[in-house]
Amino acid sequence: MIDAEFKTALEQFGLELDEPLGMSLQQYAQSLWRYNEQINLTRHTTWDLFVTRDLRDCLQLAQLIQPGEEVLDMGSGNGVPGIPLAMLRPDIDVALAESVGKRAKVLDELVTELNLPVPVYAARGEDLLEDFRFTTIVSRAVGSLLKFCRWVEPHWSQFDRLLLIKGPKWVDERGEARHHGVLKGLELRVVATYPLGSVAPELAEAEEGDSPEAADASRGVILELTKKNKG
């Protein structure tokens, strides 16, 4: 059964999951918290935080990916968004890249424990792109927009787009990235904004340059970056 506190958190924040999916996500969170006692992986160690800070990001991201896509979670850390994404979307292929060896080992143990067909690479994502191609790279809380664009700049032939989960500082990060010229030749769009408080999630689309309501501290944002010359 789904834990009563988990179910209450889902209901409180307007989210619904079927029983098998809820059980899988519950097992992931509980296993993650168990490993967290040995190695620092997450500060989101309550059901409320798991739902509002982890699950909501993944639910929004899952809506933006097409069936059959090959997705790399770059700098996976505690497995968010990659592991929940693999549970939410079994019709896609997800791989995790984590350069910190201890964390990569935990991620490998987690996906084995959860019986997920998710390879874990103890490597930097940009190094993986030397040998592997993906449809989409996803990431959360791994460097600024400037740093991320610099990391992947030599490897655009190895993937089609970036989907980056960001918080209220994304507008400042965009300004910094523009100042350093790393957005030249790229198209940046806000493809999702959603509340992180007690309001039910919503999906909104906007073109770059629109009024950045998403910069509000209570909202999450997903940015999509593509090459302008890509169809």
UniProtKB/Swiss-Prot annotation:
GO terms for cellular component: cytosol. Residues 204-231 are annotated as: Disordered. InterPro entries: rRNA_ssu_MeTfrase_G (IPR003682), SAM-dependent_MTases_sf (IPR029063). It comes from the Bacteria. NCBIfam families: rsmG_gidB. Belongs to the methyltransferase superfamily. RNA methyltransferase RsmG family. This is Ribosomal RNA small subunit methyltransferase G.
